[in-house]
From Swiss-Prot:
The modification Phosphoserine is found at residues 30, 83, 90, 298, 444, 514. This is Albumin. Ca(2+) 2 binds at residues 38, 280. The keyword Metal-binding applies. Ca(2+) 1 binds at residues 31, 269, 274, 277. Keywords: Calcium, Cleavage on pair of basic residues, Copper, Disulfide bond, Lipid-binding, Metal-binding, Methylation, Phosphoprotein, Repeat, Secreted, Signal, Zinc. Zn(2+) binds at residues 92, 272, 274. Pfam families: Serum_albumin. Phosphorylated by FAM20C in the extracellular medium. GO terms for biological process: cellular response to calcium ion starvation; cellular response to starvation; negative regulation of mitochondrial depolarization. The modification N6-methyllysine is found at residue 559.
């Protein structure tokens, strides 16, 4: 496309869109009435419960239900008469006033008490800053199948309310509309399985799959919110352009830009705690996409036939459209054109956005992070070359310079999937744990174990996929998990190597972590026998908790001996596994642990000497 024609098209479509999909608030006297009517009472209540649970993570379900009931009754009255008292107040004002009026708020949430002295929007910003990514809450344990089904059948609404509350307060940035979708799926599973002859056999695999989906969704949304907060809307919009260009390669750049702008607004609203607006605008975006399928994708119809929640989620996960068969070589517009520097100088964001769009739609097999790194490399090359006497001679081989950037994640995927296939998930997690403990031994052992277990699941998520889907799956998943590592590390920074990777560009973060060497500045921990002393209770732990106990011991061994070889660690952990198996078979298990434990510790010290 000729550049002048393209700029004109973008200007016209952009101007039209500025009056577009989401510009509706002025027509409503009452924002809360508007959202209540749009969403319906069921979803309105769910989102209000979720909002309060995200902000007040220590409150009980019963306390939140009382707040939800009061807000819903108020919204219902405003829907009947939008000019009624206080109905014209903003949602931030209404919700903030409700939080600050709670009895004993200052005692229970002393760290947030100062927020209530502020005015909007500073008050809401203050509440957001106090969301805790790692709240000190007990692990959420699933009830036995019979007890679960009894509670669900006695009061399905209360049962699902508890589910929303518990997920929300543990994941204060979870994407609100998606949590409602998962709650609906949860309800469907319980309805089906509680009528089955073997409730447990029906429930366990289905609920395990939903839990895994929720955990992955939580870290992915947290990455989006981190990106938005740290680098602003422009960075997120670039992510959205790349992602949507891959999914909708037949849509033109103006359409992709429009969709990316909308998605950025929706994501910003959810990250900002504006869940009612976020859910409402997400539904509006889905409506727009379904009304404009012809200009977006041929794969949308099945999604568009679904009801609101399912429709939006289906569109978010829709398969890639078929790539156009006649796409010209990219070099024509971005390398060979004599006006490359002129076009870049006249409209940098548009020119780079077009490059990202064109490159992304041709490479659905790349991760979004990789595509953004390539765009960053292209931008840096133009910045350098367009200032030189012969720009084309300078940037003429820029596409050749992309090769090492592409090969690095491809090699990462190949080597890690081969290791996963050889070791299985648990063995692969252990390999990752050793690798990252050596890179950042100062990080707390629980954080290292959590990170390694999450990073290790990348094999299960991605390595069985077709080759063309592996790279985007692996790198985008790793980026989300490493973002959580960074968030936890920011609270108590202990490793300069981790700080270096976490403080840089988001798209460079995964390569930075992958390239980290063993931390040679680390002074090994003193060997303490009590760290490796176990008791009979380990024998009755669920398999997951037993694995975590063993992984904790493994991390501590590496911290004691960072230079330990793979063979040394394998020998020690093999002896440890035999020790557990032997003692857990004994009638007097504790006596076995007391007798054999010190021997194991002595042998381990000797093996690592």
């Amino acid at each position: 496309m000729k550049w002048v024609t393209f700029l004109l098209l973008l200007f016209v479509s952009g101007s039209a869109f500025s009056r577009g999909v989401f510009r509706r608030d002025a027509a409503h006297k009452s924002e809360i009435a508007h959202r209540y009517k749009d969403l319906g009472e069921k979803y309105f209540k769910g989102l209000v419960l979720y909002t309060f649970s995200q902000y007040l993570q220590k409150c009980s379900y019963e306390e939140h239900v009382k707040l939800v009931r009061e807000v819903t009754d108020f919204a219902s009255n405003c829907a009947k008469d939008e000019s009624a008292e206080n109905c014209d107040k903003s949602l931030h004002t209404l919700f903030g006033d409700k939080l600050c009026s709670l009895p004993n708020f200052g005692e229970k949430y002393a760290e947030m008490a100062d927020c209530c002295a502020k005015q909007e929007p500073e008050r809401n910003e203050c509440f957001l800053q106090h969301k805790d990514d790692n709240p000190q809450l007990p692990p959420f344990k699933r009830a036995e199948p019979d007890a679960m089904c009894t509670a669900f059948q006695e009061n399905a609404e209360a049962f699902m309310g508890h589910y929303l509350h518990e997920v929300a307060r543990r994941h204060p940035y979870f994407y609100g509309p998606e949590l409602l979708y998962l709650a609906d799926k949860y309800t469907a599973v319980l309805t089906e399985c509680c009528a089955a002859d073997d409730k447990g056999a029906c429930l366990t695999p289905k609920l395990d799959a939903l839990k895994e989906k929720a955990l992955v969704s939580a870290v992915r949304q947290r990455l989006k919110c981190s990106s938005m907060k740290k680098f602003g809307e422009r960075a997120f919009k670039a992510w959205a352009v790349a992602r949507m260009s891959q999914t909708f390669p037949n849509a033109d750049f103006a359409e992709i830009t429009k969709l990316a702008t909308d998605l950025t607004k929706v994501t910003q609203e959810c990250c900002h705690g504006d869940l009612l607006e976020c859910a409402d605008d997400r539904a509006e975006l889905a409506k727009y996409m379904c009304e404009n399928q012809a200009s977006i994708s041929s794969k949308l119809q099945a999604c568009c036939d679904k009801e609101m929640l399912q429709k939006s989620q289906c569109l978010a996960e829709v398969e890639h459209d078929d790539m156009p068969a006649d796409l010209p070589a990219l070099t024509a517009d971005f390398v060979e054109d004599k006006d490359v520097c002129k076009n870049y100088a006249e409209a940098k964001d548009v020119f780079l956005g077009t490059f990202l769009y064109e490159y992304s739609r041709r490479h659905p097999e790349y991760s979004v992070s990789l595509l953004l790194r390539l765009a960053k490399k292209y931008e840096a090359t133009l910045e350098k070359c367009c200032a030189e006497a012969d720009p084309h001679a300078c940037y003429g081989h820029v596409f050749d310079e992309f090769k090492p950037l592409v090969e690095e994640p491809q090699n990462l995927v190949k080597s890690n999937c081969e290791l996963y296939e050889k070791l299985g998930e648990y063995g692969f997690q252990n390999a990752v744990l050793v690798r990252y403990t050596k890179k950042a031994p100062q990080v707390s052992t629980p954080t290292l174990v959590e990170a390694a277990r999450s990073l290790g699941r990348v094999g299960t998520h991605c390595c069985a996929l077709p080759e063309k889907k592996r790279l985007p799956c692996v790198e985008d998943y790793l980026s989300a998990i490493l973002n959580r590592v960074c968030l936890l590390h920011e609270k108590t920074p202990v490793s300069e190597q981790v700080t270096k990777c976490c403080s840089g560009s988001l798209v460079e973060r995964r390569p930075c972590f992958s390239a980290l060497p063993v931390d040679e500045t680390y002074v090994p921990k003193e060997f303490k026998a009590e760290t490796f002393t176990f008791h009979a209770n380990i024998c009755t732990l669920p398999e997951k908790e037993k694995q975590m106990e063993k992984q904790t011991a493994l991390a501590e061994l590496v911290k004691h001996k960072p230079q330990a070889t793979e063979e040394q660690l394998k020998k020690v952990m093999g002896d440890f596994a035999e020790f557990l198996e032997k003692c857990c078979k004994q009638e007097d298990k504790e006596a076995c642990f007391s007798t054999e434990g010190p021997k194991l510790v002595a042998e381990s010290q000797k093996a690592l000497a």
